[in-house]
């Protein structure tokens, strides 16, 4: 999803495009799923909320479902968008939803861009090395575990 921010009337600034990246705060039994990156090299070994870019013409929640299917092999259900927007490397911004796995779902597996997954309790949330850009969103997601 690309959003355009129009300049104010009379402004000489160019139109800026934002590309939305969706992230999933996948919650289960009071735990949050964290995914360790395996690629690209500059991110490998650090942890994130799974997700990815919204494709042109795709609704953000549909992108979230697609990305979790591609990256984790699960059909998750988006529940609620966590208020806020977190800047990533320009022109990307992160939007995060809480999500859940329907009863009887397969266990998530690290299929794409990740080499390990962990379900973290509130006490364990900060035991992993989160990507700096995900920390504010993780903080918001962790508040929903209480």
Question: Where are the language model's segments positioned?
Answer:
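Short secondary-structure boundary/capping segments
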Residues: 24, 39, 85-86, 107-111
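Short, charged/polar surface micro-motifs in flexible loops or helix N-caps
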Residues: 27-32, 40, 55-56, 74, ...
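Active-site-adjacent beta-strand/loop module that shapes the phosphate/pyrophosphate-binding cleft
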Residues: 75-76, 85-108, 118-124, 134, ...
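Conserved N-terminal beta-strand and adjoining loop/helix that marks the start
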Residues: 2-33, 53
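Conserved Nudix-box catalytic region and its N-terminal flanking loop in Nudix hydrolases
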Residues: 31-70
């Amino acid at each position: 999803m690309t959003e355009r921010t129009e300049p104010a009337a009379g402004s000489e600034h160019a139109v800026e495009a934002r590309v939305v990246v969706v992230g999933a705060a996948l919650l289960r039994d009071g735990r949050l799923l964290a995914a360790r990156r395996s690629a690209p090299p500059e991110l490998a070994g650090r942890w994130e909320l799974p997700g990815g870019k919204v494709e042109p013409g795709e609704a953000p929640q549909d992108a979230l479902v697609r990305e979790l299917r591609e990256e984790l092999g699960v059909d998750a259900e988006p529940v609620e968008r966590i208020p806020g927007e977190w800047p990533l490397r320009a022109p990307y911004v992160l939007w995060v939803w809480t999500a859940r796995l329907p009863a009887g779902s397969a266990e998530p597996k690290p299929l794409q861009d990740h080499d390990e997954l962990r379900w973290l309790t509130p006490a364990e949330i900060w035991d992993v090395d989160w990507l700096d850009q995900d920390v504010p969103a993780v903080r918001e997601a962790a508040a929903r575990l209480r």
